Amino acid sequence: MKGFFITGTDTDVGKTFVTACMLRTLVDKRIRATAYKPVQSGAQWREGKWIAPDVDVYRKVIDVTDEDGCTYLLQTPCSPHLAAKIDGVTIEPDHIVAHVHQLQQTYDFVLVEGAGGIAVPLVDDSFLIAHLAQLLHFPLIIVARASVGTINHTVLTVEYAKAFGLQIAGIIMNGFSTPKNEIEQENIRMIEEMTHVPVIGEIPHMTNFSHQQIVWRKEWWQ
């Protein structure tokens, strides 16, 4: 079965947008694909129920319920291990793996979006996003910012992933100026040189995005 594990160098770097764009590409190619957020903190209350905001973005591409798109929906917008404690929920990694295996019975390609970065704890410090990626055996896509500071964040994320023996398919950098400035160009060069991992996607800055913008444009691929 095919899939990717999408992680990031930080929270709010664009993982959900990248996941949705990749999902759109797969669906447009008539590949049976879905996106899945194992643990979602910061649930939103709408129309009398809690909604998973990232799964709501996936719904702009495919018809997916919160139950299919997320195993643990937590209310407090903080690290999953703490949000689970506040909500009185125990995160069971085996349940997440079983959920992915269930999705693989229906879909040919599964995109798994992590929470925050790769060192984010799911169960205190005993089980991190990196451990979950190990269990699922999907290659990583690392989403990084294009701006100043990204070299350090991205190199550390790559080295941490390598320490866990994780395969990295590539880095997607998000939030470039149009056209890219000299600093951003140098960020790409140094990240590739220092990590030996290719930057496979370059996404321009967007203040927000609509249904029509959730599409992977060919000029973003590198």
From Swiss-Prot:
Binding site for Mg(2+): T16, D54, E113
Cross-referenced HAMAP family: BioD (MF_00336)
Required co-factors: Mg(2+)
Regions crossing the membrane: none
Subcellular location field: Cytoplasm
Reaction catalysed by this enzyme: (7R,8S)-7,8-diammoniononanoate + CO2 + ATP = (4R,5S)-dethiobiotin + ADP + phosphate + 3 H(+)
Name of the protein described by the UniProt record: ATP-dependent dethiobiotin synthetase BioD
GO MF annotation terms: ATP binding; dethiobiotin synthase activity; magnesium ion binding
Enzyme Commission (EC) number: 6.3.3.3
PANTHER family linked: ATP-DEPENDENT DETHIOBIOTIN SYNTHETASE BIOD 2, DETHIOBIOTIN SYNTHETASE
GO biological process, one term: biotin biosynthetic process
Name of one Pfam family that matches: AAA_26
Pathway assigned to this chain's UniProt record: Cofactor biosynthesis; biotin biosynthesis; biotin from 7,8-diaminononanoate: step 1/2
Residues the entry annotates as binding substrate: S41
Domain of life where this protein originates: Bacteria
Origin species: Anoxybacillus flavithermus (strain DSM 21510 / WK1)
Similarity remark: Belongs to the dethiobiotin synthetase family.
Annotated keywords: ATP-binding, Biotin biosynthesis, Cytoplasm, Ligase, Magnesium, Metal-binding, Nucleotide-binding
CDD domains: DTBS
Gene Ontology CC: cytosol
